């Protein structure tokens, strides 16, 4: 047992070494390194495999004996200041190690197929290995200083990966946005770390928690200052885990390659914030006000993310907002004291969301040769539809991930999400309603994504550049009236202008076969040149095998925390594992199996309603009458129509939050810079330059006055005496 614990330092070292060696080869021997790029990828995968084996052995030992192991050695020692470097092995560490390594190795295998035609193939694996090593170092850290170091490395790697295609302006802007937004959180995190060091005199977790609790009980620390430091510390997870109001970087992060989107949004960067809150949970739970802030931040983020995902047209962006919403669930659970439920949802969501993102990557990879390689084309769900026929494995695995995220039993997320909703009701009815409403919205937008992507008929062939819009009846009479016989230079010009009503018409009309519509068009507009229609095809095995592997935990991983039918909850494997960590709150757990069934019925009902609503609006055509649109047309008017349009604009414009930030911070900073420039140029420089100009002018005047002419002196004397007499007379 001791041997495997002593080998824990190898875990982050394995991917770090492969990243450094391949990176140096790419830097100094670029052509030679690129010529053996497949060997480089295999070496990255093998090095991470070694780390994965060690992590699983560590977890096995933890499950058996529930012991906590910490090893540290002195790094800096200068009087009272002692900084140590080492690693900590406890249940939380093992959970995160297994999560990060298992998802990362699957993403690496998947990336071999997805990035095979990219010139930056080797560079991508270098960044990916460094990213994984940074996250593994973060979760092994036994103190706040070491966490902060790896925290910054994770942020740097995310900057490199989001901006991987840096020649694309949108990607360059996205990585800068992510970096700057996270700077705000990192600054708060640093202030919080320094504040707690000032209070307790230690960076080590055990000493920090014990010392702070004793000081708080003995009233030796100001509660206000403690709350301030904890709030600053919480600012780091708010930015890193995309919590409101520092969530704005997350959808733009979709500019990076899809495999890294899966890793960032499943097990690494966004999970780092949740991990830090869980790690600092013994400290936060002593401050009820901070716990309330955490819970409400999570609740607002969960609901906001769900509403922003409501009418997204971009496949990856819809999944990004889904991630934001689910991270809100986790933060909410930790804030209400449901430590186990928060970690449980972190585990189940990681595998389900990784499956969904890799599935979306398979779709995008197949769509690019047909519609183009721009993200607003290959990721646009308007061009998709019917992909399950052409990509059955991708479609089936994507459906499994969707069912899991919606909370449908027996899939993984059902068990964790249901527990969060139940515990939310015990904490506060308001938060309970938010959690329940978010569950319904999640089911709606996730199945909206699934239906638009995989069901119906393939729609990309219905759009041909420079084709009269009226020739293919996809937009209804309204579109014909608006565009007439004008030709569309780009389909995207039409797509971006579409309203919710027109988009609904588009989906309804596409329940008929696209081939039939195009056949009618060809009959009406014969052409001498034959038109060939392309269809997506299933991805190769290097991309399909990871999807099939991730389907297994998506279906089964939830059972590690599922309640056993013995009349009591908390007797499952996850609870047994976490009991040694001492952070469970049994009073917040449901009491028995029957109560769990009652709560489950409620959550399943609201999820089913969301699925049914999505099915009505976006589902397959076979069970719907063709005049369904006319039947619901009156319902789209009035207050309901206003609500739909408002939600559409709310979703498309990201809740107007980016616009507010642009007005307040960007334009405000520009105005402040202009005012500063004006003050510097005309006031500061004016005083300096004015002094010189005044001296020069005075000197010139005196030079001309001292010309040596008696008449000038006499005139000056008379003029001066006249002025003096006038002043005296005025005074008298």
Swiss-Prot record:
| EC class (word) | translocase
Residues folding into a coiled coil are none
Molecular function, one GO term:
quinone binding
EC numbers on record: 7.1.1.-
Catalytic reaction list: a plastoquinone + NADH + (n+1) H(+)(in) = a plastoquinol + NAD(+) + n H(+)(out); a plastoquinone + NADPH + (n+1) H(+)(in) = a plastoquinol + NADP(+) + n H(+)(out)
Give the UniProt entry's GO cellular component terms: chloroplast thylakoid membrane
Gene3D superfamilies from the UniProt entry: 1.20.5.2700
Give the membrane topology, semicolon-separated if more than one. Multi-pass membrane protein
Summarize the subunit comment.
NDH is composed of at least 16 different subunits, 5 of which are encoded in the nucleus.
Q: State the function annotated in the UniProt record.
A: NDH shuttles electrons from NAD(P)H:plastoquinone, via FMN and iron-sulfur (Fe-S) centers, to quinones in the photosynthetic chain and possibly in a chloroplast respiratory chain. The immediate electron acceptor for the enzyme in this species is believed to be plastoquinone. Couples the redox reaction to proton translocation, and thus conserves the redox energy in a proton gradient.
Q: Which family does the record assign?
A: Belongs to the complex I subunit 5 family.
What protein name is recorded for this chain? NAD(P)H-quinone oxidoreductase subunit 5, chloroplastic
């Amino acid at each position: 047992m001791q041997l495997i614990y002593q080998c824990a330092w190898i875990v982050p070292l394995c991917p770090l070494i492969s990243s450094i060696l391949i990176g140096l080869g790419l830097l100094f021997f670029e052509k030679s390194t690129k010529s053996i790029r497949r060997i480089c990828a295999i070496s990255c995968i093998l090095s991470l495999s070694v780390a994965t084996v060690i992590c699983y052995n560590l977890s096995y030992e933890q499950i058996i004996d529930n012991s906590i192991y910490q090893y540290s050695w002195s790094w800096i020692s200068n009087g009272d200041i002692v900084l140590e470097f080492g690693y900590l092995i406890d249940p939380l560490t093992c959970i995160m190690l297994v999560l990060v390594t298992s998802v990362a190795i699957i993403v690496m295998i998947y990336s071999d197929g997805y990035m095979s035609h990219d010139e930056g193939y080797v560079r991508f694996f270098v960044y990916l290995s460094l990213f994984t090593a940074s996250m593994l170092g973060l979760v092994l850290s036994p103190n706040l200083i070491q966490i902060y170091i790896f925290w910054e490395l994770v942020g740097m790697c995310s900057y490199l990966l989001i901006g991987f295609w840096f020649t694309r302006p949108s990607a360059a802007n996205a990585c800068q946005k992510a970096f700057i937004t996270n700077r705000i959180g990192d600054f708060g995190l640093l202030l919080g770390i320094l504040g707690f060091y000032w209070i307790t005199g230690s960076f080590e977790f055990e000493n920090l928690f014990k010392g702070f609790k004793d000081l708080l009980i003995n009233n030796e620390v100001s509660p206000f200052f403690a709350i301030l430091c904890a709030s600053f510390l919480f600012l780091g997870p708010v930015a890193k885990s995309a919590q409101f109001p520092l969530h704005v970087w997350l959808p733009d992060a979709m500019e990076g390659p899809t495999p890294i989107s899966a890793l960032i949004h499943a097990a690494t960067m966004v999970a780092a914030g949740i991990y830090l809150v869980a790690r600092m949970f013994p400290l936060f739970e002593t401050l009820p006000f901070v716990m309330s802030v955490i819970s409400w931040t999570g609740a607002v983020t969960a609901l906001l993310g769900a509403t922003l995902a409501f009418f997204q047209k971009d496949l990856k962006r819809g999944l990004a907002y889904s991630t934001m919403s689910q991270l809100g669930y986790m933060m909410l659970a930790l804030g209400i004291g449901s430590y186990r439920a928060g970690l449980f949802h972190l585990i189940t969501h990681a595998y389900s969301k990784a499956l969904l993102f890799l599935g979306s990557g398979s779709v995008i990879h197949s769509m690019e040769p047909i519609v183009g390689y721009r993200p607003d084309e290959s990721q646009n769900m308007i061009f998709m539809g019917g992909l399950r026929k052409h990509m059955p494995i991708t479609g089936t695995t994507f459906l499994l991930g969707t069912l899991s995220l919606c909370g449908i039993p027996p899939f993984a997320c059902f068990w964790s999400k249901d527990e969060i909703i139940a515990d939310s009701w015990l904490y506060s009815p308001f938060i309970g309603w938010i959690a329940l409403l978010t569950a319904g919205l999640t089911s709606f937008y996730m199945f909206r994504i699934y239906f638009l992507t995989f069901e119906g008929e393939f729609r990309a062939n219905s759009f041909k550049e420079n084709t009269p819009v009226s020739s293919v009846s996809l937009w209804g009479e309204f579109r014909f009236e608006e565009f007439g016989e004008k030709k569309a230079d780009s389909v995207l010009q039409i797509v971006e202008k579409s309203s919710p009503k027109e988009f609904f018409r588009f989906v309804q009309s596409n329940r008929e076969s696209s081939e039939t519509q195009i056949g009618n068009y060809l009959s009406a507009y014969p052409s001498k040149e034959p038109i060939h229609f392309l269809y997506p095809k299933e991805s190769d095995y290097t991309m399909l095998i990871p999807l099939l592997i991730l389907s297994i935990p998506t279906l089964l991983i939830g059972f590690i925390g599922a309640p056993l039918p013995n009349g009591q909850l908390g007797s499952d494997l996850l609870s047994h594992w976490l009991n040694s960590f001492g952070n469970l709150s049994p009073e917040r757990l449901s009491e028995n199996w029957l109560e769990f069934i009652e709560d489950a019925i409620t959550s399943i009902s609201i999820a089913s309603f969301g699925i049914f609503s999505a099915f009505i609006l976006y589902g397959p055509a076979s069970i719907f009458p063709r005049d369904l649109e006319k039947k619901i047309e009156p319902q789209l008017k009035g207050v309901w129509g206003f609500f739909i349009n408002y939600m559409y604009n709310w979703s498309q414009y990201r809740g107007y939050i980016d616009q507010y930030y642009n007005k307040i911070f960007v334009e405000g900073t520009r105005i402040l810079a202009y005012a500063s420039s004006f003050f510097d140029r005309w006031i500061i420089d004016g005083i300096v330059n004015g002094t010189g100009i005044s001296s020069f002018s005075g000197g010139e005047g005196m030079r001309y006055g001292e010309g040596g002419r008696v008449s000038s002196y006499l005139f000056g004397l008379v003029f001066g005496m006249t002025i003096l007499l006038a002043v005296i007379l005025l005074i008298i």
